[in-house]
Amino acid sequence: MVNLRVRCIVLAGALFAVAGAAHADDWTLDGVERVVAVSDIHGAHQELVATLQTAGVVDAAQRWSAAGTHLVIVGDIVDRGDDSRASMDLLMRLEPEAAAAGGKVHVVLGNHDVMNIVGDLRYTTKGEYAAFAAEESPAVREAAFQRHLSGRASDTTAVEDVRREFDHAYPPGFFAHRAAFAAGATYGKWLLGKPLLLQIILAGQPGLLTTLG
């Protein structure tokens, strides 16, 4: 298991490196007038919305209202809290809205975002899985259970007890969540296109704002 995790992390690192070489110019910004930075959302979606509204980044309808402002999300959208999907959906919607107004949304990857991509789910909550439950096929879930059950052929545990263990280990929505974070799927593809480093040169300022997720 440890070796598998190491291989996954190395693979993810290689993917990020390739993406970085292709889009490095997008991650170095010069002459930015205003930056709003938010870090460690961790599924606290309502708090994110309240913060953005207080900063004038979005209006009461959660639409971009900050003109040429650059919003920087400093890593860790996911894990620990239940509403990370709502936060990702909001940020994905705000990206084109900000661009149309002359601003920009930047998402810098944090370790928890990378962990979800590579399948390290130690801090993922049942609520985060539940957000994907409506998209989880009963057939996919049952097939996964049958594979789990076949691996315990010599076990004398009753099937209903094994199913309870299975449901605890793989809560409703687990398999749809994993599918959505695959490299070619909605959230996996979106996150894989994000940098690990963002450098902003503020207008009229001699220094740099350098952000690591």
Labelled PLM ranges:
Residues 1-5:
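N-terminal secretory signal peptides that target proteins for export/translocation
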Residues 8-18:
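Bacterial N-terminal signal peptides
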Residues 22-213:
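Feature recognizes metal-dependent phosphohydrolase scaffolds
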